[in-house]
């Protein structure tokens, strides 16, 4: 039964077993060799050798999350355009038209976001409606 497996399958199983064993070994050694001090000082926050002051709960602006979402949305286009550029000769004009439509759709989305003010950092311009 086991002889029917290809050598690559055995290599994959050995790799997975080795990775699992290494993870368990590191977790086990950390548990055995690690310190177990409990107390009031253990639960205090520590920042680069300086005692912290104030609250650690800072409020961040939603603008950073907006920029992160826009980066993810418009950053996804790069792998598609790279793959298109690599296979340009094989795809011909059909691939060129598809890539042009893809980039055009992304540009329409970018212009829409600019029009509604999603790319502006000032709150008064962002409240503008798209039909104004």
Curated annotation (Swiss-Prot):
One GO MF term attached to the UniProt entry: quinone binding
Enzyme Commission code: 7.1.1.-
Entry keyword set: Cell inner membrane, Cell membrane, Membrane, NAD, Quinone, Translocase, Transmembrane, Transmembrane helix, Transport, Ubiquinone
Domain of life: Bacteria
UniProt topology in membrane: Multi-pass membrane protein
InterPro entries: NAD(P)H_OxRDtase_bac/plastid, NADH_UbQ/plastoQ_OxRdtase_su3, NDAH_ubi_oxred_su3_sf
Listed transmembrane segments: 10-30, 66-86, 93-113
Coiled coil: none
Reactions this protein catalyses: a quinone + NADH + 5 H(+)(in) = a quinol + NAD(+) + 4 H(+)(out)
Presence of the UniProt keyword Hydrolase in the record: no
GO CC terms in record: plasma membrane; respiratory chain complex I
HAMAP family assigned to the protein according to its UniProt record, in alphabetical order: NDH1_NuoA
Family statement: Belongs to the complex I subunit 3 family.
Subunit structure: NDH-1 is composed of 13 different subunits. Subunits NuoA, H, J, K, L, M, N constitute the membrane sector of the complex.
Full protein name: NADH-quinone oxidoreductase subunit A 1
């Amino acid at each position: 039964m086991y002889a029917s497996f290809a050598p690559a399958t055995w290599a994959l199983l050995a790799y997975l077993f080795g990775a699992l064993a290494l993870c368990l070994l590191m977790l086990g050694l950390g548990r055995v060799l690690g310190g177990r001090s409990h107390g009031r000082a253990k639960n205090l926050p520590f920042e680069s050798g300086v005692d912290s002051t104030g609250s650690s709960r800072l409020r961040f602006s939603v603008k950073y999350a907006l920029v992160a979402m826009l980066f993810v949305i418009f950053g996804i286009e790069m792998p598609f355009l790279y793959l298109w550029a690599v296979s340009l000769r094989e795809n011909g004009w059909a691939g060129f038209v598809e890539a042009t439509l893809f980039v055009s759709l992304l540009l329409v989305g970018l212009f829409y976001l600019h029009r509604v003010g999603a790319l502006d950092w000032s709150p008064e311009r962002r409240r503008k409606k798209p039909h104004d």
